[in-house]
Amino acid sequence: MVRLREIPRTATFAWSPGAASPLIATGTRAGAVDVDFSNETCLELWDLGLSSQDASQELQPIAKIGTDSGFNDLAWTDSEDNSRGVIAGALENGSLDLWDADKLINGSSDAVISRMTKHSGAIKALQFNPKHSNLLATGGAKGELYISDLNNIANPYRLGSAAARADDIECLDWNKKVAHILVTGSSAGFVTVWDVKTKKESLTLNNMGRKAVSAVAWDPEKPTKLITSTPLESDPLIYVWDLRNSHAPERTLKGHESGVLSLSWCPQDPDLLLSSGKDNRTLCWNPQTGQAYGEFPVVTNWTFQTRWNPHNPNFFATASFDGRISIQTVQNTRTDTARAIADQNQALDGADFFAKAQTQPQVSNFSLPKAPKWLERPCGASFGFGGRVISVGLIEKGKRASKIKITPFEVDEAVAKSTETFENALKEGDLRSICENRASQAASDEEKADWKVIEALISENPRKGLIEYLGFQDQADETADKLAQLGLDKEDDEVNGESAKESRGSGAKKHKRLQSMFDANPEADNFLSDLAASKGAKTNNPFQIFNGSETEADKGITRALLLGNFEKALDVALKEDRMSDAFMIAICGGQKCIEKAQEHYFSKQTDGPNYIRLLASIVGKNLWDVVHNADLSNWKEVMAALCTFADDNEFADLCEALGDRLEEQIRSTEDKSLRKDASFCFLAGSKLEKVIAIWIEELREYEQKSIETAADDTSFSIHVRALQSLIEKVTIFRQVTKFQDTERTKDADWKLSMLYDKYIEYADVVATHGRLQVAQKYLDLVPEKHPEAEIARNRIKLAMRHATPQRSQQTVPTTRTPVNKPLPQASMYPAQPAFSATAAAPAAATTAPRNPYAPPTAATAQPVNPYAPPSAAATQPQTSNSYAPIGGGGYTPAGYQPLQPPTYGAQPLGGSVPPPPRASNQSPATVTTYTTATNLPAWNDLPEGFTKPPTSRRGTPAAAAATISSPFPNQSPTLSQGPPPPGAPPTQRAPSVPPPPKGTAPPPRVTSPPTNLPGPSPAANPYASLPQSPPMGSAMGVPPPASIPRGPSPYNAPPSMPPPSNRYAPSPAAQAASPQLSTRAPVPPPPHAAASPYASQPASHPPPANPYAPSTPPPSQLPMQQAPPPQAPPSRPSTASSQRKAAPAPPKYPPGDRSHIPSDAMPIYEILSADMQRVKSRAPSSFKAQVEDAERRLNILFDHLNNEDLLKPNTVADMAELARAIQARDYETAKTIHIDIMTNRTEECGNWMVGVKRLISMSRATP
């Protein structure tokens, strides 16, 4: 519960009616004395401003008017004639005053509606009728009870006679169901039920010896039930009555310690009742069962009035004689948790010791066992992701049991149908039929053209298909027809003595392609063969090579040909401009001569026909000239030339360039008809990034046009259909062209970003219709680094029950705890651990759902006796070790293991078996205390961030409990500690346990701490290293030599090393990482010990998995036999040499320097630091401490790499491989390498290894 606002007045009050922002009217309480002894009486109106979360400013009245006397009661009702209603005041001088609330707020001088003085004495109570707001009942001294009508306020009528009774009427209440029934309570103990219709009393309750009545209230739903209360200090009771049996109360509610002064029955929920009284308390009850739910914050004086808000029962107000009216809510804000966090945030050094005393007002927390009725719903429905509707309905009316139904839901059935049809067609693989179907159903010529082009690309020879689509398949025959019309194909009348007609054959077509213009003729076939001279053959046509009439050019050509010098002959022919001769010579001379002849020919034909330039581009393989310079009206001819002659490696770019020219013309001329031509070019060149922009523009235009013309379709249906068509075109196009997206690995600046947005939108649409797998398929086409796709993918995977990082808060089973919990007693002797002859396995524990950012959760302790000293675990051990100190058993972090209290009558462990002796320089064993978690959520918790938790004056990170083993911040604590020797008094004694508190604790006081008693133990850091597991050997093993010191465990720091008292001192784990920092020689183990008798206690409740929690290695093998108690080692002589500290070796380079990291180790630094920054930027702010701790540990690794110490070359190589695995998000490989290093190279591991472990877990959990 939280106190939302406070009005600094000692006054009676009334809530404003209606659903508007709540106002409160206050009237100075009659008989009350202010702190300044003012005798001013007034009526004030207050705006609570509940819409603002800032509750720090003191409220000021928005209206105020003086009165002649103090108030005993106030009422506020709706009125047809007054917009904000009418306020009625019961004054001490017997006057009944009425005010217009709207005029009061506006500051009008005529706010007073009327003033009536029918009562001869003080008016003690008044109330408007809930059914007829114009009827007002007033009761006061001498038994006077009047009913007033606001429409005729001057003529009230009285109920009862003056002679009937002379006691004062203290309270009254209208029946909530029967409008003419009224109940009154008097100082003489009479509880009378009146029938206003007959103006007579109906009955009088037998009020248990005529005890005075301070408050009455009717049940809001049952017309025959009411409650009464007595103001007597000796008998502060609340009676529940049923008028069907008026001789005795149905139930008696006992909870107040002094007289009850006020009651308020919630109008919206008959199971909620508020009561306040002289014991300064406000209680919440269930009057139907008599159960007391709890109490609200205790004040310092009587609480004389409490009222629910009539419209919003989440709020209620309580007035007390300490000068405050508190406006509160029934919702829980988990104040105990906030206070515990504030205590943990206090600094651990002496500067803030006294700052831990909290000065906040005392509060009480309780949770209602069931939701209030106004929060219950008989039925409800919610749309769920994935095309589901979750509906809740009652199984049977009147019973508090409901059933849940999950049914599929589709916004538009056509969407699901078209999606399913398309996906099935894709599975069948008949792409041509899809294109034909979509082209026939196309809504525009542009869309139809797109599908036709895609269909043309399906053929085995796509270029030929494109040429045929452009209409060039019959161009040869058409050209032949035109030549025939011009008479250019006429031949001589006779060929070899035969007419041309006869030579062609009678059945031949008149015009054919060039290759078929000559019919088969045997003589013609033998023509060339006849020309070839066979061996020994003679001819009748002699000739001379030189006849004397030749020109010099002829002679030069002849001589060159005779010698086979075709290039020289070509040069002469070209020089003489004999082009026909030159081409024939070039054909004989080979490719080089042909290219030379072509080049000369084209250079001479610069002003020739257009086909010459086209031929030049084709022959010179320079189609860019045609693409960039040909007129765009002939773009089809250009496209045909590209399809015919372009090389495969240039074809796509040439098509794109032609499409770009068409787009430029579209922008310059605004001729949108050219868009389909540009689309053709981009489709032919497989340029999806270019055509998608045109398609999206067409999609928008189609939507706008369809919305304007559609009669029945919704805008959503139109948009989804257009989007479906776009996705289908893109999908088919990608399959036909085997399009490969090369930008999926990029982080930004994608060419297909517009398409990616449509993919994400389409995935959301189809997922909403229940097609999750289809949605996932299209999201897989979007780059992994796309921020919106990443969110959508996680959402889809969650809906499909795939494993994804969970960021929700842990749900812990709620248990009911007392309001004031006693502090657990801390014992200076350790609890007995349970040892087993076999390897210990942690007991199965119920863990909350995994949360990668949640801090470790303490195990649940068994609540047996909070005042008994702690004892051994409840499990029965097979063999017990009485001398094992308490520690992080089973690799559980210190501070998380519960102390199991014994049952009543159990003897404290400290007095049962004497502990073993300890060395003279050893410190007492660390004592771990356990506090039950109190941050358990309830149904009525306020939303996150509604209230601001209290913060300490210093921003020291929170830490859990542990003892300070050394008063000097820079001194390294001993690695092994034990309990005090037998018979010797302990160094510290735990304070005695206080008796159980009575009732609610009073407000806290600030006191000085005792000077000779130990101060509060600072909390052990929950994010520090785990306790070290002692080395385990075989049952009959030989102890290791004392001269070989054991370094700290590669997994955790020793359990006896708490954080130093100075917040700026190095961490103990860092101090213990180097053997030179040890303050004393290691103590050898006791003789004949199979293993260390100070083994850690195995944890019975392992903590939940948490990437930010310290790593938890598997449990160690426990010894097979129990070792006897060790003997005390001899005390060392006090010499200067033994007390001298070993000076730590200074590092080669200062911490933070990264300039000397070797090249082979540089990838470790670059990759891990970059990934750490990624995690740091995305992790929730509430887990800042965990992230910073991991970063600090990584910096230790980087310092080692910079100094080239600790890590061997093979470890550096493995760490580089681990870093690359993290970069590739191959966390399993990284984890395997990490475990291998920790297992096989423990001497190279330190605090940095825990940082690497946490980074792997956090990186995996961070999207």
UniProtKB/Swiss-Prot annotation:
Residues 992-1019, 1038-1061, 1100-1132 have a biased composition (Pro residues). Coiled coil: none annotated. GO terms for biological process: COPII-coated vesicle cargo loading; endoplasmic reticulum organization; protein transport. InterPro entries: SEC31-like (IPR040251), SRA1/Sec31 (IPR009917), WD40/YVTN_repeat-like_dom_sf (IPR015943), WD40_repeat_dom_sf (IPR036322), WD40_rpt (IPR001680). WD repeats lie at residues 5-47, 66-109, 118-158, 164-204, 208-251, 255-295, 298-338, 382-407. Residues 488-511, 801-828, 840-1159 are annotated as: Disordered. GO terms for cellular component: COPII vesicle coat; endoplasmic reticulum exit site; endoplasmic reticulum membrane. Residues 805-818 have a biased composition (Polar residues). It is found in: Cytoplasmic vesicle, COPII-coated vesicle membrane; Endoplasmic reticulum membrane. Pfam families: SRA1, WD40. GO terms for molecular function: structural molecule activity. The COPII coat is composed of at least 5 proteins: the sec23/24 complex, the sec13/31 complex, and the protein sar1. sec13 and sec31 make a 2:2 tetramer that forms the edge element of the COPII outer coat. The tetramer self-assembles in multiple copies to form the complete polyhedral cage. Interacts (via WD 8) with sec13. Component of the coat protein complex II (COPII) which promotes the formation of transport vesicles from the endoplasmic reticulum (ER). The coat has two main functions, the physical deformation of the endoplasmic reticulum membrane into vesicles and the selection of cargo molecules. Belongs to the WD repeat SEC31 family. This is Protein transport protein sec31.
